[in-house]
């Protein structure tokens, strides 16, 4: 749906809007959610040690603050910097991985997708749908996309492609 919304909102503006204007508008629209989610996640993380999150107690505050900064800048965290034990790209705000892919989709829209013909977009949608069906059938679900490794990035891009392009 986000691809339809982006196209509907911006397709007719490109004659009087630069790439910078587009990206600025998208940052203003999306990034406050990112920062707020990271701050709430950092507070919950810091005060949530124990129970199912025993790894939290051993995380130095400085490392948590570094993860917070990286998260606020939407820089994915590699598994080696994990602080919760789940290999998430954004350990302080798990769902932020989907916004990471949304940013990528916005970049693809601005640089490539908006210039494609309807026929080519339709063909891309069919290809993306095939990848989505393949993922669901071979994996048995559509779960994934939140870790910075090849398999999870593949799931994330697959989950992004069809809904955005179609």
Show where each model-derived region lies.
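Hydrophobic cores of alpha-helical transmembrane segments in multi-pass inner/ER membrane proteins
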Residues: 1-4, 37, 162-166
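Divalent metal-coordination and catalytic microenvironments
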Residues: 3, 27, 102
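Hydrophobic alpha-helical transmembrane segments of multipass integral membrane proteins
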Residues: 3, 39, 129-132
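Structural signal for the C-terminal ends of transmembrane alpha-helices
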Residues: 6-14, 43-49, 111-119, 166
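Transmembrane alpha-helical segments and their boundary/interface "anchor" motifs
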Residues: 10-70, 105-106
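Aromatic-enriched alpha-helical transmembrane segments of multi-pass intramembrane proteins
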Residues: 62-166
């Amino acid at each position: 749906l986000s691809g339809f919304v982006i196209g509907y909102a911006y397709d007719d503006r490109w004659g009087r809007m630069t790439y910078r204007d587009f990206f600025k508008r998208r940052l203003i629209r999306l990034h406050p959610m990112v920062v707020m989610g990271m701050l709430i996640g950092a507070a919950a993380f810091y005060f949530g040690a124990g129970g199912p999150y025993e790894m939290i107690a051993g995380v130095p505050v400085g490392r948590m603050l570094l993860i917070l900064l990286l998260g606020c800048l939407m820089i994915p965290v590699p598994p080696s910097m994990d602080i919760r034990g789940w290999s998430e790209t954004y350990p302080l705000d798990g769902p932020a991985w989907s916004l990471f892919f949304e940013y990528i989709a916005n970049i693809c829209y601005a640089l490539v997708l908006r210039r494609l013909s309807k026929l080519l977009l339709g063909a891309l949608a069919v290809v993306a749908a095939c990848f989505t069906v393949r993922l669901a059938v071979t994996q048995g679900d559509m779960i994934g996309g939140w870790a910075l490794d090849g398999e999870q990035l593949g799931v994330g891009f697959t989950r992004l492609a069809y809904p955005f392009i179609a």
